[in-house]
Amino acid sequence: LKKPLAAGSNALAYDHKTVLAMNPLTSELSLPGWDSSYTKEGMKELLHRYESVDEEALWKNLTVFLKEVVPVAEQADVKLAIHPDDPPWSMFGLPRIVTNKENLRRLLDIVDSPYNGLTLCTGSLGVNPENDVADMLKTFAGRTPFVHLRNIKITGAQCFEESGHISVKGSLDMYRIVKTLYD
């Protein structure tokens, strides 16, 4: 959150090569949004517990969770809205599954209920140039109770920084995205 931008503000920047060079087991690793209460030993234990978890195992765990939680959400009239993985690619050997249109569809199909929904974060999904965020918004309109409008600027392969919201400041067509929401 300390990357200075030309306008004088600071933003989050992500460089996958930098992350690949980090070792969460030997350094005082901290990334934005991480639970800072983990000690080095706690982080080692956490990563050790996930060593055998691949994408399919994560899908299986998410399926069990959603099948238990969504009926309760329905009874309480609470719409769930999962946030996409940010970034939408593996880090430190940990799988990511809420990453693209196909996986969003798979997630929603686990429990076909309006209470099993998406937080459609334009930045998280938009850092992958293959993701057409406006198309995703249109496709999943009825299952998206929350939209997180965030523009990003792709600065290289798996590298990005947050940017101003208007389209010309970043890599996303924010006008098209907002127009899709409006329509």
Where are these regions (language model features)?
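Helix-loop segments that flank and shape redox-cofactor active sites
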Residues: 86
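Histidine-acidic metal/acid-base catalytic patches
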Residues: 40-49, 56, 60-79, 89-183
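Active-site-proximal, glycine-rich beta->alpha crossover segments in alpha/beta enzymes
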Residues: 1-63
